[in-house]
Each structure stands twice: as structure tokens, then as C-alpha cells.
Amino acid sequence: MVERGFIVAGARILKRTWQIYVAHVFLFAIYIAEIAYVASSFENPLYVEEMNALDFLKTQDVTIMQALLLKFKPANMDVLPLYIVLLMMFPFALWLLIRNASLALAISVALYVLTWEFGWNFASYPSGHWFFNPFAWQLLFVFGAWCALGGAARLAPALRSPVTVWLAIAYLVFAFGVTLTWYFPRLAFLIPHWLGEWMYPI
């Protein structure tokens, strides 16, 4: 990336964005066709509703346009739209990352915090918001690029610290405990009420 320059890197990112968008459109068409076929074959309209495809079958013309705008997403088709939006935004972040990686990371963290504070998100069709919020998930993209541009070397001493290792172990134990409550509801009392409200749905 650094050797070829920002223009080439940005063009490649946008090209990949277009490829993923086209793939998403094809997957959407196949997915909707399969849902319609299964629903008609087994005469189960509830299946269409569960897959979040009921609006498409009622108003195809409007819903197709909303799907092309990445606003309408059937069940389990949230990931590629998120990736498309993040890749579209990334060339702008890349421009700043090359010049001042730490500043770019700071802006990314600030955007993440403001997203939580003000509830920023993209609107979905026919109602609601994106399940995977691009304003929040952008932090992973920027952090990964920051690490690749030298940030990982700066973090190395902290990552090798015994304190970090024990914090990671404590987190794994906590996550294991939370997971156990899903399979053994009697253990749900171990999760504080305020923590459960903050954490779910996940």
C-alpha cells in the first residue's frame, strides 16, 4: 500500500467494494427466490415473515430499490452491507492513516463514543436501524490499519505484560460464565440486571 501510493490503494479498495456490492445483489436475488420457493412449497407464510421477506413479497418494486440502497436486508444478510459501507469509507480513513495514524485512530475512537452517546446509525427499511452499526464497527477497520502501520509494534510491550494476560483470562472466564447462563437459565441470577440490559441482545 505504502509503496504503490494512496491513489492505487484507494482505487483497489473501491473496486473491491463494487465487487462485493454486485455479489450482495446476486445473493439477495437468490436468497429471496429460495425463501419464496420454500414458503410456497410448504404453504407456511410465517417462514417468510421470520426471514424478514414479507415486505418484499408485498411491494417488490419499492423493496428492490431499498435493497439496492442497502436499506432492506432479509434475515442473515446484514454482514455484506456493513462490509460495503466500511470499504466505501475506508479510503478517506486511509488518507489520514498514512499521514497521521494516531490522529486517525483518535478520530475513530471519538466517532465510536459519539455513536454510543447519540445513537447514530443507518436507517433500515421498512423500519428500524442496521443490526451491525457501521459507525461503531469502523473502529475495528481503523484499528487494524493502525496496527499494520506500526501500532502493533507499539502495543507489543503491553500485550506481553502479565497484567494483560491475566485480564484476558478473566475476560474469558466471564464470557464462559455468561454463555453458561444461556444453557442453564438457573444461573441467570449471576449476571447483574444492569449488565444484562446493557449486553443483550448480542
Segments (PLM) and residue ranges:
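Alpha-helical transmembrane segments and their immediate juxtamembrane cytosolic regions
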Residues: 1-202
